[in-house]
């Protein structure tokens, strides 16, 4: 399913005490990262956390808009929307 791509709206809280997938706020995924919101550190942390959580390489997860905003649009390549939601629900509980 390499050609499959999902766009995922995300709200990020940078500078948190720990990095985690915090849950859903409507259709928007809430993510907390310990990295600060400076020089792309929080964006890189978001991409790495999502890639690890979804079992993808870091190249499979990219922020496509909102790089300087807490609200971002993330592209996930290689998984269907159902697979993304299932894997996220496993860590959110």
Where do the PLM segments sit?
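Contiguous, often N-terminal, cationic amphipathic patches that form binding interfaces
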Residues: 1-48, 53-58, 62-68, 72-93
């Amino acid at each position: 399913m390499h050609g499959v791509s999902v766009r995922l709206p995300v709200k990020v809280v940078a500078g948190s005490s720990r990095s985690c997938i915090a849950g859903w706020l409507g259709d928007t995924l809430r993510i907390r990262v310990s990295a600060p919101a400076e020089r792309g550190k929080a964006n890189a942390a978001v991409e790495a956390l999502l890639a690890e959580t979804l079992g993808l390489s870091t190249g499979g997860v990219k922020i496509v808009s909102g790089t300087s905003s807490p609200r971002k649009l993330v592209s996930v390549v290689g998984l269907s929307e159902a697979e993304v939601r299932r894997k996220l629900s496993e860590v959110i509980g």
